[in-house]
Amino acid sequence: MRYGEAGQSHLLPFLGAAALFAALTIMAHSVVLGLAAVIAGPVPAAQTALSLSRKAVSGAAQEEAASVAEAAPESTGTAASQPEAAAPTGGIESYLVELLGDDARPEGAGAVIEKNYPQGSGEKYVACGAGSIKNNTRQTAADIAAEIQDPLPFGVEKDSPDPQILIMHTHATEDYRLSAGLWYSPGDGARTTDMNLNMCAVGRVMADTLNAAGLNTLHDETLNDYPSYTGSYENSRAVVQRYLAQYPSIKVVLDVHRDAIETEGGSRMAPVCTVDGRQAAQVMIICGCDNGGSVRLPGWRQNLRFAAAWERSMEGMYPGFTRPVLFSYRFYNQDLTTGSLLIEIGGHGNNLNEALYAGQLAANGLVQALLGPDT
């Protein structure tokens, strides 16, 4: 019954008592449904697609001079997770999300440019197996080449009841694009506090993969860069120190980020490669070096050996997967262990699925670097 038909009350005298009751019941039901429809109203297609994509994410278990400054997080609230036993992973498909199609592309969308960044050559680069190290320090290439031939300064125990690895995120709110096409929404600050869409989702895949391989791994999901980006490294340092005090068995601390490479025209770069027929984000390890002054890293040589071992492993397993290790005068709290590194998983131009897959591949490479090729 349409709402306007309710005014046709001149029929009522001709209805019996039972028929009158039925008519009034039907009329009331129609009015309720009509009002509900008016209140709900139509949902724009792009908004619907984004909502579906985020629901799919929630249900899925889930720098270099070129980098640009990024905006503040888009969401409100802060969260942290205590370490939990991670579920074994049977494949990347269980983590992947539904991406937005071109029907959701807004007017004025920015462009994304895909690029595979090759290994470097020349005097600034030191060969590292199939990979390479970009030397932005005063250390000689010969010194670096000799150093990375030495064994790892630590050993990890497989199937240990004690944690061996900690994964955390200084810039946890960094995120990725949610579009399948090469575009991003105008005004997208590439940050979110949604831990199914930001760096925590990538760290989760890495931790699951490492735990499934017998490497006891903790994953901290503290949003160290929220609500303030300033002071995020001080925040994450305190987090790591608490874990090391509670779990002195931890040998490796990985600070997992993503890069942000952008052209002068505003196009976002997506470092990509193809592994086993699936597109993945490229990754880049950053290892700091002591400069004798403002950057104090007495254990930089040990960290560099670790970086080289991981780089060799990843690039050997997945050719084209890594960008050269960046060896530079950067601190990044890498004084806390002899196995402390920062790794960039793709950039803000990559879509989330490429980053999730890259996280799994990077973890596979770490397993081989720490346990050997026969694991």
Go through each PLM region and give its residues:
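N-terminal catalytic or cofactor-binding beta/alpha core of small enzyme domains
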Residues: A17-I250, A260-G265, Q360, Q368-D374
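Solvent-exposed loop/turn segments at secondary-structure junctions
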Residues: A172-D175, L223-P227, R258-T263, D290-G293, ...
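Active-site-adjacent substrate-binding region
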Residues: G299-L326
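Active-site-adjacent mobile loop/cap segments within catalytic or ligand-binding domains
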Residues: G320-T375
